[in-house]
């Protein structure tokens, strides 16, 4: 159940972060409220994941890494963000870091 809460938290965080552009600097009410509500739900789900037994370091590493990778992908595909070697390398390093944390946790 902890992983379900975590992956729901990641999904909601990615949606909320994607909405940031549409808030236009928090000047548009509806997208701003949706974005803020999304972040509130995200942190609630993350807390539920941790309270259901997931270790905090693993939960946060997965949440931030998967969320970051998803946001970069969405930005490149849908928000006209340019692809660069630095972005690809950065996301790859994040993924390697999360795998390393999970492997270290298994031993």
Curated annotation (Swiss-Prot):
The chain crosses the membrane at residues 2-19, 29-51, 58-77, 82-104. InterPro entries: Small_drug/metabolite_transptr (IPR000390), Small_multidrug_res (IPR045324). One of its GO terms (cellular component) is plasma membrane. The keyword Nucleotide-binding does not apply. GO terms for biological process: response to antibiotic. It comes from the Bacteria. Keywords: Antibiotic resistance, Cell membrane, Membrane, Transmembrane, Transmembrane helix, Transport. It holds the Pfam family Multi_Drug_Res. GO terms for molecular function: transmembrane transporter activity. It is found in: Cell membrane. It is a multi-pass membrane protein. Belongs to the drug/metabolite transporter (DMT) superfamily. Small multidrug resistance (SMR) (TC 2.A.7.1) family. Mmr subfamily. This is Multidrug resistance protein mmr.
């Amino acid at each position: 159940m902890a992983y379900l809460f975590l992956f729901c938290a990641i999904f909601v965080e990615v949606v909320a972060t994607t909405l940031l552009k549409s808030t236009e600097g928090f000047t548009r009410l509806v997208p701003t409220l949706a974005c803020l509500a999304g972040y509130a739900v995200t942190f609630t789900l993350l807390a539920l994941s941790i309270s259901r037994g997931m270790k905090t370091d693993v939960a946060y590493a997965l949440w931030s890494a998967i969320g970051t990778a998803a946001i970069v992908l969405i930005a490149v595909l849908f928000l006209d963000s340019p692809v660069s070697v630095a972005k690809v390398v950065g996301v790859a390093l994040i993924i390697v870091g999360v795998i390393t944390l999970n492997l270290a946790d298994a031993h």
